[in-house]
Amino acid sequence: MGNYQNAINQAQQTGGAPNVTGVRKATQSSWGYGFNIEQAISDDVGIFGRWSWNPGTTEAQTVDISRSLSGGVSIKGSRWSRPKDTVGIGYAANGVSSSQISYLQQGGMAAFIGDGALSYKKEQIFETFYSAKVYKELFISADYQRIANPAYNSARGPVNFFGLRAHIEM
């Protein structure tokens, strides 16, 4: 993994945009922590909350998130005579570290983001879904997501995503 500040320093010496691939070290490591809580409020209602943090000094191997806070609620369909159905709503706010912001603003590319024109603002995601049991073990879910400041850029978005999923339980 490469260190963002090392890539910035190298770019200042050589010119051009910072690039973490040029400063990768086999011994580089990263760390972080996360907390998750899920709680049934009743037989039909559940809530969740998650919080995670890492220093954000090195490139990511999975997602470009240094800190995240999310929460939501799900309600089973028993209240409207559809006990196998579920409706849910959730919200997440994600951010990156100051060294990654600087790296991206100077033209660096991360695992999934970067175009050299970062106007940083926290990414905010709203999601809602409805999962319906349509036949025996077949469930169909409709999903909507709205992302404000996608890829941490206030000059982008918001974007809307609509999804349809099928799930079979065996």
Give residue ranges: language-model regions.
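Sequence/structural signature of outer-membrane beta-barrel proteins
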Residues: 1-2, 54-59, 96-98, 147-151
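Surface-exposed beta-loop-beta
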Residues: 1-36
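Hydrophobic, lipid-facing positions within transmembrane beta-strands of outer-membrane proteins
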Residues: 31-35, 51, 67-73, 124-128, ...
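Residue-level signature of outer-membrane beta-barrel architecture
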Residues: 39, 75-77, 132, 168-170
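Short loop/turn motifs that connect adjacent beta-strands in outer-membrane beta-barrel proteins
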Residues: 43-44, 77-87, 134-137
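Transmembrane beta-barrel strands of outer-membrane/channel proteins
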Residues: 47, 51-53, 71, 87-93, ...
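Outer-membrane beta-barrel "beta-signal"
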Residues: 89, 158-170
